[in-house]
């Protein structure tokens, strides 16, 4: 969790390592997206599950979801709302992966629902 994997490890398991990122990528990459979202005054926050590549937070996207937030939400509230969204997104991504419903084409995915 919150670790950057070596290129060697990623190469050994292409499209088999899933990352959950706590923002609706490509917005707010990096380690503190909820803080960045709060500072920008966003109206929605989200989560993205994607396959890990050597480029940080840039792998093929498997699943995404968003939740509406309001101007009075604190950073702590954004984190809590976001964590709830992350659970849903990660569980769907794992399910699709295990059921072999994900086709990777270059840096995009096709999901067979």
Name what the model sees in each region.
Residues 1-113:
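Donor/substrate-binding cores of folate-linked one-carbon enzymes
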């Amino acid at each position: 969790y919150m670790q950057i994997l070596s290129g060697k490890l990623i190469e050994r398991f292409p499209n088999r390592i899933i990352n959950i990122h706590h923002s609706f990528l490509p917005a707010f990459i990096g380690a503190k997206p909820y803080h960045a979202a709060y500072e920008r005054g966003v109206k929605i926050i989200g989560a993205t599950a994607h396959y890990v590549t050597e480029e940080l937070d840039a792998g093929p996207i498997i699943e995404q979801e968003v939740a509406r937030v309001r101007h009075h939400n604190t950073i702590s509230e954004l984190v809590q709302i976001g964590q709830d969204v992350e659970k849903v997104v990660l569980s769907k991504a794992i399910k699709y992966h295990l059921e072999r419903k994900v086709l990777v084409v270059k840096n995009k995915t096709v999901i067979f629902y």
